[in-house]
C-alpha cells in the first residue's frame, strides 16, 4: 500500500508541476506582449496622454462625452499639449489615449493573471516547495513596475514634455527582469 500511495503522490506532484509550468509560460507570453504594447505606446507618442494615475478607479476609460472632455482638459493643461500637440482635437486625443490606456489596462490584467492563479495554487498547495515566497515577490515586483511606470510618466509632466530616459530605462529594465524570472 505505501508504494501505491507514493506513486499517487508522485503523479499529483507531476500534475502540479505541469500546472505551474503552463501558468509561468503563459505569463512569460503576456509579459512579452506587454513589452510590445509599451514600445508601441512610446513610438506613437501616447505615453503622456493620461496625466493622472488612478490605479484602482482608472480601469475603465471615459464612458461619456463629459468624462472624455474632462480627461482631454487635463491633457491640454500638460506641457506635452503645449509643446507638441497644440491644437489637437478630441478625436486626435482619443487616438493617443488608447495606447496608454491599453498599456495600463494590460498591466492590470497581468496582475490578475498572475495573482489569481497564484492564490489558487497556494490554497491547493500546488506550489513547489520553496517557491511560494519567490512567486509572491514576483507579484510584488509586477505591482512595483506599475509604480515605476507612473514615476516615469510623471517625469514628462514637467516643463519639458519628455520622459526621463533614465526612468524609461528603469521601466524597461524591470520589465525584462520580470520576463526573465
Regions flagged by a language model, labelled:
Residues 59-62, 93-105, 161-174:
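Short aromatic-rich membrane-water interface segments that cap or initiate transmembrane helices
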Residues 1-17:
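Short, Lys/Arg-rich, polar N-terminal cytosolic tail immediately upstream
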Residues 20-59:
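N-terminal signal-anchor transmembrane alpha helix
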Residues 22, 129-142:
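Membrane-interfacial loop-to-transmembrane alpha-helix junctions, especially the N-terminal start
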Residues 110-116, 172-181:
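Hydrophobic cores of alpha-helical transmembrane segments in multi-pass inner/ER membrane proteins
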Residues 51-82:
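Long, glycine/tryptophan/cysteine-rich extracytoplasmic
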Residues 74-114:
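Individual transmembrane alpha-helix segments
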Residues 41-50, 147-168:
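Interfacial helix-loop-helix junctions of multi-pass membrane proteins
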